[in-house]
């Protein structure tokens, strides 16, 4: 039976992640650098040598984690798909007692970049103008997102046709905002929320629903929507 010393020699050592130049990085590090370059300058900036310089790593370090630039670009698309499409679909499925509350759940995406990244969305859609492959990915994402929004309306009793139209209204308005790079103060955007909800659903949201929404996006508890734009409380159901 081998002794402890010989057992150590028999165990294969994990390959080191350093070379003469230092740390090789990691897949996530290279992907994050690619993301930053895409957001800042578009897909043409996502190239191995500039990324290596950005990370202060050797060019050859890249090939420890990705076969080539194409594989890195595929990883960027997958990251966008998982983050933005994934988040939107989760929000359409989130618990809600009313369609107004369900729409407010979706609006979380428009106010929280950790959920839905508008800069990433803009960059991918700009890239799609140059690439049929990426355009196809965007079209697939659009279909999935619209289906998710339509199903959300159907859960609350809307017919197929009107659910589809309302879903498109919500989605295409927001994609339009992103595409033309609209910049508005957060307070103004928040003040418009109840009116967007009513426009998209045909029903005014209740104060309790708006307050829950605000609690997720406003740190200052003194912020009140009705101090900016008056909101009418819908009448309560007769008991």
Locations of regions flagged by a protein language model:
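N-terminal intrinsically disordered/low-complexity leader segments
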Residues: 1-25, 204-239
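Amphipathic alpha-helical packing segments from all-alpha helical-bundle domains
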Residues: 117-122, 132-158, 162-168
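Generic hydrophobic, amphipathic alpha-helix propensity
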Residues: 23-35, 51, 76-84
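Helix-turn-helix
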Residues: 29, 37-75
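Hydrophobic/aromatic residues within well-ordered alpha-helical segments
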Residues: 69, 76, 80, 84, ...
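Hydrophobic/aromatic-rich alpha-helical bundle segments in the mid-to-C-terminal region
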Residues: 155-216
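Hydrophobic alpha-helical connector segments
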Residues: 89-122, 167-170
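Short helix-capping/turn signature of helix-turn-helix
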Residues: 66, 112, 124-130
